[in-house]
Amino acid sequence: APLEYRGPFKSIPTKIPGVHFSEQFKESAKIADKITICRSMSHGEAAHERGTHNMFTGYRPSPALAYPSIGSVVSHDFGSRANLPPYVCIPKVPNEFAGSGYLSSSYGPFGLGGDPAKGDFKVKDLTLPNGITEDRFNKRRSLLNTVDDHFRQMEKSDALSSMDNFYNDAYSLISSKEAREAFDMKKESDKTKERYGKNEAGQRMLLSRRLVESGVRFVSMTY
């Protein structure tokens, strides 16, 4: 394409014959045969908000129906594994269309509440609060179960079921060493972090890889 259309950067060949990337993606070009290039994504919306809805749900916006995000559909259909949330957003839930829509809110995304690109990165509520021992934690959980059993006998609702699932997932995260390690960026060497790039995009992608390898089924990353 002419310079005025393509910009100042040239294209370079990749590992896939006939496929070219921008010269800014030299390392990606070397492994192009190991990634999937999505060419089918398009939409006819003029507004960014409506286009974002399409991206996250696969549907055009409807005034009559709140569609679930693709991550929530995956969460609903496949569930969790390895005590990890099935659907995680890095670093946080990016917009209202990333939610569970008409599905139960228990299939909504798990937001980190922190940025893996920052040195003090910590996932919210993944460890016990200061001053709370494991014994005290277990007693609180037992008391909560007693109260919940009482309410379940009196009333059934999506809100109560979702809270049950929320607490159970939280307990699994806190009590699982493997789950905590999946979010622990300190497990990665400086060399690996350098290869991904010590910036927002690189470190968020690195954490995404860790989570998928550990058992998270769907990761949505924003940078």
For each predicted feature, which ranges?
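Ligand-binding pockets and gating/stacking loops
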Residues: 1-223
